[in-house]
Structures are given as C-alpha cells and as structure tokens.
C-alpha cells in the first residue's frame, strides 16, 4: 500500500470502527482531474445504506479537518461486495478455498496476472492453484487482488 493510503488508513480506520463497522480497506485513485477515495466497510450482519451514510459523514468531517488529500476529491463508502478486494494477509486467509484474481507489481515466473483457487496462506506468501500447478506468490508483490464470485 502506498504511503498516502497507509496514512489515510491509520487516520480513518478508527473512525469506521467507532461506528461499529470493520474497516475493510481503501483505494485512492485519480479520476480525471480529481482524486477518488473509496472506503470499504464490513459488518457481520451486512452493510446497509445507513452504515455507509454514517461512515461517510464522519469520515468527511475528519478529512475536512485533517485535509490529507490535496485538491478536490470524491468520497465513496460501500461494502466490499461479492467481488471484494483483498488488501491484507488476513483477508486472503479468510477466503482460502475461493477463486481469486490478482495482479503483481512486478512479473513473477514471467507474468503479472494470476487467477486461480486460493489454497493457502503461509507466512508472507499466498498460494494459488492454477491448472493443477501451484504458485507461491510473495504477498509484498501483490498490487491488487479480489475474490472472483461463483455464479
């Protein structure tokens, strides 16, 4: 996770958790000429519109005071959804047995994109099974990952 995203997470996770939600993660991207800050929240009983509204209101207040994002930005708050992004090793551990898709920061074994069954998480490595071949991928190389829902 980039430095600015790490600072935002440290600033905003306690706000989300104080409202009874789990801070799942965040994405900070450029969208045209302004930034887009996406915050993903989770709740055991499921995330409702009211949860998103409450988190958005409180996070907006903190961002207005702290002003960590230069220029204009859009704030979005939502549940991670069925195709949820995976940000931490704990997230990967929760979804062992599921199909995941991920992109690496740099090539590993000649490729950057992988999609397969998440079979294990050991130490700081994620293990994927793709076409009967096992890939052991260092977590620090993962740029983006998400669960691929089954229909």
From Swiss-Prot:
Q: CDD domains in the record, alphabetically?
A: YlxS_C
Output a single Gene Ontology CC term carried by this record: cytosol
Do you know which Pfam families this protein is assigned to?
DUF150_C, RimP_N
The record ties this protein, via InterPro entries, to:
Ribosome_maturation_RimP (IPR003728), RimP_C (IPR028998), RimP_C_sf (IPR036847), RimP_N (IPR028989), RimP_N_sf (IPR035956)
Q: Does the keyword Cytoplasm apply?
A: yes
Q: List the disulfide bonds.
A: none
- Quote the Gene3D superfamilies the UniProt record gives: Ribosome maturation factor RimP, C-terminal domain, RimP-like superfamily, N-terminal
* Entry's Gene Ontology BP terms: ribosomal small subunit assembly; translation
What are the alphabetically sorted keywords of the record?
Cytoplasm, Ribosome biogenesis
Alphabetized SUPFAM superfamilies for the sequence: YhbC-like, C-terminal domain, YhbC-like, N-terminal domain
Q: Where in the cell is it found?
A: Cytoplasm
Q: Which NCBIfam families match?
A: PRK00092.1-1
What family is reported?
Belongs to the RimP family.
Q: What does this protein do?
A: Required for maturation of 30S ribosomal subunits.
Q: What is this protein called?
A: Ribosome maturation factor RimP
Q: Which organism is it from?
A: Saccharophagus degradans (strain 2-40 / ATCC 43961 / DSM 17024)
